[in-house]
Structure formats: structure tokens, C-alpha cells
């Protein structure tokens, strides 16, 4: 199986390194010093599940250089999907699988605007990881997991085969017959990153202030209400269980959107709290906390995209 990792950040770098170490034919899309480091030295992975140093990687900053692949794992930021989706066809064959792992709920729909929907599966990942230096990925929290499923809710042979290959690489994975609901469950989880960005606090610091903790609950309850209005099959206790999962995270936990805002980089604001606001208006569900976060961070987002 030939696999293309489209975006070698904390997500793509982690899962790509595991697949490469297991003997799969893996190529990587990267750029700058990170690209040069992984071409020369491979990927150095520091993980709670064990460190590895891969061999030098096949990598490029051009998608077309990666070669025709059986599986394309999309690890770029959510807002970059529109930038790369047309180019993906240059490395696809008639049976290629496109597996997006983006935050948010828009990836499959945005990919299907230029790629035949039969190639696309729904997906998400759970991991706390980041680039710490060129060629270096750190996994610092959560058991790395890929959840994926057919958009028509069936269990297909092709995804059963992919699941077996993930297992060979010691990647924890789950096949879902309702991947849309699974994606919305993660969406509920990630959108607190905007609140951390506004407060400029780690999860532990933010959680110590009761008023801010209550704001977090309200933020999640808004997403729950929007999801229910969209037909998502949320369990009634999902908000409480989501907060319980937050409370088990390390004190200094941050999410990628949070770090991007703090560092003055373009972020996934539009695909997280912004999406809650936009869909909320479509389904006529008020989202005042998410709207406050979204509008508060918009000037910083605009500034980050100006440079």
C-alpha cells in the first residue's frame, strides 16, 4: 500500500512516521526547513508510546511529486483544504481513498467539490502533537487514534483493509457506521481552543476560574444545540462527558488553534467557532458565547493573514 501524507505537521508527521516505521511506502508533503530535515534525516518522533527515528523520507513541497497513491491522508489545516484539493487528483487512481483528518465538520464536503465523492471517507483523529523543531514531532497527550468511516454509513471491504494496515503500524483506529456524528463529537471537543486563545490560558489555568469554566459549559451547550438541530445523534450527557475528558488532560494542554493565535499565525477560527456561528444562524440556534469568541479573535486572524 502506497500512502501519501498531505501535510507533515503534528498529525501527519506522527501517523506518517508510524506507517513508515512499519514498512509501508510513505511519501510526505512538507515545506521549508522541516522538509529538508525529513528528506535528509527522516522524522524524529518523541512519543508517550515510544520514540522512533525513521529513515530519510520521500518528501516534497509539491503534491504531484509524491506519486500516485492508494491512500491520501490529509493532514493540512482545515482552511488549506481549498488550496490543495484540485492538486490531489494528480496522485490519485480510480480506487484511491482520500482520508481527511481535519478539525471541524467541513472537510469532506469541501473535498467533494473537486473530487468524486466515491474516493472520500469521513475521518478524524485524536492526538496532542506538534512540530518542535525541523524534522521533529512531539506526541504529548491522548492515545493517538484515527476514527473513520464511509459517508454512506456502510462497512466496506476497502476500509476494513485500511483498518488492518493501520493496526500493523500500531495505530489505534476505529471504523464507524456514523462518522458524521463522530466528527461532530470531536467538534464539540475542539472548539474550546478558541476560549483558551481569548483567555491566553492553558486548559488547566482556565479551568481554575469558575466563571470561565461555566462559560466553557455554555460554549459546549451551544454546539450541542446546533448539532441536534442539524440532526446529529448526540447523547444527552455528551457535554458532561466531554468536560470530564478535558479534566483528564495535562494541566498545560493547549490545542493547535490556541497556539496559532498566540503565535500570530493563521488559524482554524473560521472552521471552529466561526462554523458554530454560521451553522447556528442557518438552523436558527443562538450561539452568543461562540459568537463572542469568533468576533473577538477575528481582528487577530485578519492580522495574521495580512503578513
Question: Locations of the language-model features?
Answer:
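Rossmann-like NAD(P)(H) cofactor-binding subdomain of soluble oxidoreductases
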Residues: 52-136
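NAD(P)-dependent Rossmann-like dehydrogenase/reductase catalytic/cofactor-binding core
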Residues: 164, 217-307
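Short alpha-helical
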Residues: 33, 79-80, 105-106, 154, ...
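Short, well-ordered alpha-helices that flank and scaffold nucleotide-derived cofactor binding pockets
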Residues: 17, 21, 86-90, 113, ...
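Internal alpha-helical scaffold of NAD(P)-dependent oxidoreductase catalytic cores
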Residues: 37, 90-91, 114-119, 134-186, ...
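NAD(P)+-binding Rossmann beta1-loop-alpha1 motif at the extreme N-terminus of oxidoreductases
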Residues: 1-51
